[in-house]
Amino acid sequence: MITHRSNNVQYEVTPPSVEEDLGPQFEFYWTRQKDPHSIRRKLILAKHPEVAKLCGPEWRTKYIASAVVLLQLSIAYALKNTPVLSFKFLALAYVVGATANQNCFLCIHELSHNLAFRKPLHNKLFAIWVNLPIGVPYSASFQPYHQLHHKFLGDEVLDTDLPTPLEATVLSSLLGKAFFATFQIFFYALRPMMVTSIDMTFIHLLNVLVCLVSDFILIKFGSANSLWYLILSSFFAGSLHPTAGHFIAEHYLLDPPKHYTQFQDVPPLETYSYYGMLNLFTWNVGYHNEHHDFPFIAWSKLPLLRTIAHDFYQPLPKHTSWVRVIVDFIFDENVLMYNRVKRETAKDKSVDSKTTKTQS
């Protein structure tokens, strides 16, 4: 009972049970604990030292990626006289184009880890070639930002995969999440530049120049519709498309804990894998715990890594459908833009010029 001190009226108040679900938490899941990947990597190598032999480039990558690039450029040329808003044009852009461009996005992801060639420069140059069907320059900037994501997972400043506080505040409603899921490609393209700066290099300039020349040639010998096909393919690949589910599935908490004390509780699992058939089109990016544990193992050997270290990966929660991930993300009221594990940037944690220059 509580008695109001001015009118002596008594109120009966029942405090919530410790076990009661208090609803969604409108705050990130802050922790000071180290991310689990480096810890698990050491444990796996200690128990399964043969895993180290899986590291290194995959020779087939360049041939598969080149076939996808040529497929997209061929379709773009073939659609030069097809109206952009026609069913044929939009259906091809969504079904074939988005799947192919998602493949290009994720091949560039492989190349950012130098997993197609032994020399970093060769991977960077090949990434510019794989970038052509995307329609806008992308590959040169992706690599340094993605390396920061791996090295500083969850860092409030250096991990630009994290939504900003403004995004989390504005977009955590049903409509906000639907907007984010529909236009997430723009968030992933623009957010890094607004959060963390990197040095511009000759590779960036070459990426822009080659992409512009490619677009010009495509318009000259095809038409503007040809370029629109590539742009729409890229948009659909980062929108409400089955393969786009990986963007959300990788690190968002879709089953958040009912209670969490910031900086005190053990953080929930912050990386999730998916082992379904869409990995066939996406360079096995669904093997995401495996990838973060061993970022220098190529896509083709991640299933073998999981088999060897089955005792480590089998107990981990996983997704069974990227489409289900998108649906749950939008419609589950307990899933917010805040549902990410986040870490403070330590004062002595900095990115020197060598980190950005050698990786950009």
Swiss-Prot record:
Family to which this protein belongs: Belongs to the fatty acid desaturase type 1 family. DEGS subfamily.
SMART domains named in the record: Lipid_DES
TM region(s), chain numbering: 67-87, 89-109, 125-145, 170-190, 202-222, 228-248
The keyword Phosphoprotein belongs to this UniProt entry's keyword annotation: no
Recorded superkingdom: Eukaryota
Membrane topology: Multi-pass membrane protein
Molecular function via GO: sphingolipid delta-4 desaturase activity
InterPro entries tied to this protein: DES1/DES2, FA_desaturase_dom, Sphingolipid_d4-desaturase_N
Primary role: Delta(4)-fatty-acid desaturase which introduces a double bond at the 4-position in the long-chain base (LCB) of ceramides. Required for the formation of the monounsaturated sphingoid base (E)-sphing-4-enine during glucosylceramide (GluCer) biosynthesis.
Pathway: Lipid metabolism; sphingolipid metabolism
Motif (Histidine box-1): 109-113
EC number: 1.14.19.17
UniProt name for this protein: Sphingolipid delta(4)-desaturase
Lineage of the organism: Eukaryota, Fungi, Dikarya, Ascomycota, Saccharomycotina
Enzyme kind, highest EC tier: oxidoreductase
Gene Ontology BP terms: ceramide biosynthetic process
Database matches in Pfam families: FA_desaturase, Lipid_DES
Keywords linked to the UniProt accession: Lipid metabolism, Membrane, Oxidoreductase, Sphingolipid metabolism, Transmembrane, Transmembrane helix
One Gene Ontology cellular component: membrane
Reaction(s) catalysed (UniProt annotation): an N-acylsphinganine + 2 Fe(II)-[cytochrome b5] + O2 + 2 H(+) = an N-acylsphing-4-enine + 2 Fe(III)-[cytochrome b5] + 2 H2O
Short motif (Histidine box-3): ranges: 288-292
Motif annotated as Histidine box-2, chain positions: 146-150
Location in the cell: Membrane
